[in-house]
């Protein structure tokens, strides 16, 4: 259910973009993301920090897109969010006792520190690559291509990387956790 709520704003953005334009889609994205956060809180009585950060970024960049009637802001939002996630992961690796990935999943999984560090670094590099790919697609290709890349390309890449991460984790789990 939670993943469905997280995915809802993306679907709304895509449908409204195809029916109208990037500006209606940006407004719909703000509303849908706010609704998803509210529903998550209503159902689970908590909202993850990443979801709150995403909502704030959507609200800020979406509002700037509407206020200045420029799609540059909504395009930059994707890059900024991915860059923030990458920086958070890298910062946790270098400045905290445990990598952020371990803090998020360490209660459910027992893995060696080296595995947590590699997994954390892999996700940081993945988010960095997504941020850079978004810059290229958003600013050198037509808007329709960017919307499709944002909705389908980045989503597919994230799903594939998640599956690869699960396989990597599974290979390093103790026998009793498999």
From Swiss-Prot:
Pfam families, sorted: IspA
Superkingdom of the source species: Bacteria
Cellular localisation: Cell inner membrane
Keywords assigned by UniProt, alphabetized: Cell inner membrane, Cell membrane, Membrane, Transmembrane, Transmembrane helix
Function description: Plays a role in cell envelope biogenesis, maintenance of cell envelope integrity and membrane homeostasis.
TM spans (from-to): 22-42, 50-70, 72-92, 121-141, 149-169
Source organism per UniProt: Photorhabdus laumondii subsp. laumondii (strain DSM 15139 / CIP 105565 / TT01) (Photorhabdus luminescens subsp. laumondii)
Main location: membrane
Family listed: Belongs to the YciB family.
Phylogenetic lineage: Bacteria, Pseudomonadati, Pseudomonadota, Gammaproteobacteria, Enterobacterales
Membrane topology per record: Multi-pass membrane protein
GN (gene name): yciB
GO terms under cellular component: plasma membrane
PANTHER family attached to this UniProt entry: INNER MEMBRANE-SPANNING PROTEIN YCIB, INTRACELLULAR SEPTATION PROTEIN A-RELATED
InterPro entries xrefs: YciB
Protein's name in the database: Inner membrane-spanning protein YciB
């Amino acid at each position: 259910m939670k993943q469905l709520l997280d995915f809802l704003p993306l679907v709304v953005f895509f449908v409204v973009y195809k029916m109208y334009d990037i500006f209606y889609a940006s407004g719909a994205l703000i509303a849908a993301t706010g609704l998803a956060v509210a529903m998550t809180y209503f159902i689970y009585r908590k909202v993850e920090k990443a979801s709150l950060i995403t909502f704030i970024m959507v609200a800020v960049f979406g509002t700037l897109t509407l206020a200045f009637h420029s799609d540059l802001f909504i395009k930059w939002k994707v890059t900024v969010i991915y860059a923030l996630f990458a920086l958070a992961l890298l910062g946790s690796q270098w400045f905290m006792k445990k990598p952020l990935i371990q803090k998020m999943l360490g209660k459910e999984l027992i893995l060696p520190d080296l595995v947590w560090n590699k997994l954390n670094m892999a996700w940081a590099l993945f988010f960095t690559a997504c941020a850079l790919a978004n810059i290229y697609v958003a600013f050198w290709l037509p808007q329709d291509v960017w919307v499709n890349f944002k909705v389908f390309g980045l989503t597919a890449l994230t799903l594939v990387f998640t599956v690869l991460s699960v396989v990597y984790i599974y290979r390093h789990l103790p026998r009793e956790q498999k």
